Amino acid sequence: MAKETPIQNTFDGGELSPLLGGRTDLAKYFNGCSVLENFLPAVQGPLVRRGGTQFINAKKTAEQGWLVRFQVSERVAYMLEFGDQYIRFYTDRGLLVDGGSPVEVATPYTTADLTAEDGTCAIRVVQSADVMYIFHGRFQTRKLQRLSATSFSLDLAEFTEGPFDDVNTDESVTVTTDAETGPVNLTASADIFLPEHVGTLFYLETADLSAVRPWGVYQTMSVGQRRRVDNRVYQCTTVGPTNSEGAPVTGNQTPIHTEGKAWDGDGRPITGDQRGSIGVEWEFLHAGYGIVKITAVTDGQHATGTVVKRLPSELQPGGGGSTTVTDFPISSMAPGSSSSRIEVSAPGHPFLDGNPIVITGTILFDSDGMGSNTNRNGSYIVRDRGANSYEIDASWPGPSYVYSPSSNGKATRTITVTYPSNAPTWKWAFSLFSDDTGWPEHGAFWRERLVLVRGRKVAMSVTGDFENFANKSAGGEVEADSGIVVTLNARQVNRAVWVVESDDLVIGTDGDEWLVGPIQSNQAVGPANIRADRRTAYGSRSIQPVEIGSKILFIQASGRRLRDYEYSYDTNNYVSVDTTKLASHMLRTGAVDMAYQQEPDSIVWVARADGQLVGCTYDQETGRSDVYAWHPHPMINGAVEAVETMPAPDGSADDLWMIVRREIDGQTVRYVELLRPPLGDNEDQAEAFYVDCGLTYRGDPAATISGLGHLEGQEVDILTDGAAHPRRTVSGGQVSLQIEASIVHVGLPTSCAAATMSLEAGAANGTAQGKLKRLTNVIARLYRSLGGNLGPTRDNTETLNFRRPSRPMGSPPPLFSGDTEPIPWRGGYERSARIWYTNDQPLPVTLLALLSVVSTNDDR
């Protein structure tokens, strides 16, 4: 009979699939376990018992909810509890209160809204400092703002100038308007408007600007006329004075402004050039398009709205028009150049020859006192214009009449410019997101842009202006920093389910994975420098991935695989590894939530659809480390429904938060709980926290522990000053102790268990599998541990003894480091030998190695 002394000194293979029970050819067979419960495989190799869960607070309502991290900085972070139309806040491992009341904001999301059809969270968020955008496919995007340490607000995110869907291409479906600014009526030639469009933006662009003549140098110009430069349309608001050489003309400085007014010359004449003053003032009107916010829909062809970006008058059926009224005072009147003319003195007046004017307020009186006062009020045409006077067609009443100093005479010019009739425009577009098409489901900050994603559409804001989605500049040009809309075009109509910002924007859909980035990598991302490439076809579940170093880890579409995703320079493409390949049973019921805990160990935590919490210790460094060890964490009377991480208050580690469903005192409750870290090397034994849904009493020695109403009627484990205490049942929110204690941890019992794979050792001829073998001298190598059992099966174990005769019976044995004494092995000869370690006391365990002597009979 051959004899061997094997050692399993690393457990970083985690719990392996039962399908690997015969794969002794795999290296991880010797690092893995057939059973691994409530242990954390450390990247260094040992198994460390997980800490217990600390009760933080009962969820506001008993319905399902979700957790979201709001991290302002490394030391300022909040955990958000999303529930039935509310958000609650946690910080410093407790509920955030202000004035004795929980800090809370109201939301539109009901319990049903918060959970997607596949059981995952329907909410996505993206954060920048004190602002968090909240996305839900059925609700307009919200903006959560941190106003102070205890004050938050939730408002609609009002995106400006877009984003818009594709511009209509059916020239038979047109839209007209009846105003350029303010309230406006929209009339369509077909049924295009829906009640769901109310509150969204509507884009209109002129199909034809030929009615507006191009601006040119030295064009005769009058107030009210319009000209265009490219697609920019301007209106003349002021001209220079008319002189004897001609009327005012445009200058030689092409208008380029896109707001307000500017002159194209200095407005002064040049003697001898046969022109009037050179240069007029231009007001910028529009760049060939405008935007309306729809306020009401009458029917499919009629809607009303408010203009938020001036509309071109060319969108109006009659072409629109403008009216300019100019008043100018009259200083005096006198006989004119003929008996049928009167000269009107008005220094600096703006009127031109031929202008119609209306004169009011004049008084002519007879200086001899013989005649009655009269006037020359009425409508006239300006004649023989001069810089300081002009004439009108009227006769002077007599040689003794003069213009009265008490007159309030003035002349009023009214110029109405009517533009040619226009064809209705077919260039219109609805908002990309609305109650009709749905709202953004995902977001990201990438390349100084806010990215909104829904379905196959990806919209990007103006660079550096996160809420502005204008796809053109104010002058109508598409520029490098303009807003962008990209469509993920593929054979299948797959829906985006996650977005991760990296060098490229990585988008996972339910059928494939995409990269969105610049065509020319040495140039800025812009409308003319953007690409969307389909790279792989794994497909994903709607769970936000986690990032570990340069890798992205996502749940595959079935919910039963966790894949890592990383760019490979060898293949010039992204490559993926199925981390559940060796533990395919671990996500068998499907994942519903996921979080990453970077410190103290690199662990991906997953909440399964059946309420099981599982983890994957992940440490991948090419040529150095190849750890992806899965480990389940069953709970007594507990189903984990949501997980999230945030930095611990002291920043030394990441805390895993969870919402746990439990049955307490005959009622279904949901608690917010926090996974406590294992006992640290610098912590006293009394600080060991290995109970679930637990609380800690710390104070003067006490024999009764109260404040346990959240565990009413439950049998609980107790650790008193580092010693395991007999279990008690909570009654009236309290338990009684056998002896007084100063540090007491009370909570639901937990247990841990680890079982090796079928041992492959001791055979002199070939494999040991299937051969009779016997184990003796089984030893556990432990570090700062206490309690536990060893045996051939879970239910057939021998208790390890750590109490020494020199230790007083009234005090707990100290934590043990070293090799346990060999125990009587309860197993006999067997063909599939395993070593089990179990511990059902609330005590710390770090299992470094399992050692044994294996005698194998080679006769089979």
Where are these regions (language model features)?
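Short linear interaction motifs
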Residues: 47-50, 61-63, 101-127, 178-185, ...
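Glycine/proline-rich low-complexity spacer/linker segments in large multi-domain proteins
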Residues: 750-788, 792-800, 849-850, 856-860
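Small/polar beta-strand repeat architecture
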Residues: 4-21, 27, 101-123, 159-179, ...
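Beta-sandwich interaction modules
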Residues: 108-126, 438-439, 736-738, 806-842, ...
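Elongated alpha-helical scaffolds
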Residues: 78, 82, 107-143, 507-508
